């Protein structure tokens, strides 16, 4: 069980390989980078909100 935290830390520290598109892009293709950026931004916002609002509702920016 002592190896599990070490494995998780190494997994988080390892750089991810860049994605390679198998198909050439055409003018009709929507760039996936914008989708990835939007998803990443949304997940970061939800993560920050979850950390902030978990025990301290007064620090939550959308708390009403």
Curated annotation (Swiss-Prot):
Comment on protein domains: The cysteine framework is V (CC-CC).
Signal sequence residues: 1-22
Species whose genome carries this gene: Conus lividus (Livid cone)
Tissues/organs with expression: Expressed by the venom duct.
GO CC annotation terms, alphabetical: extracellular region
Disulfide pattern: none
MF term (GO), any: toxin activity
Source species taxonomy: Eukaryota, Metazoa, Spiralia, Lophotrochozoa, Mollusca
Keywords assigned by UniProt, alphabetized: Cleavage on pair of basic residues, Disulfide bond, Secreted, Signal, Toxin
Protein name: Conotoxin LiC121
InterPro entries: T-conotoxin (IPR031565)
Sequence similarity: Belongs to the conotoxin T superfamily.
Subcellular location: Secreted
Propeptide boundaries: 23-48
Post-translational modification: Contains 2 disulfide bonds that can be either 'C1-C3, C2-C4' or 'C1-C4, C2-C3', since these disulfide connectivities have been observed for conotoxins with cysteine framework V (for examples, see AC P0DQQ7 and AC P81755).
Domain of life: Eukaryota
Location (main, coarse): secreted
A Pfam match: Chi-conotoxin
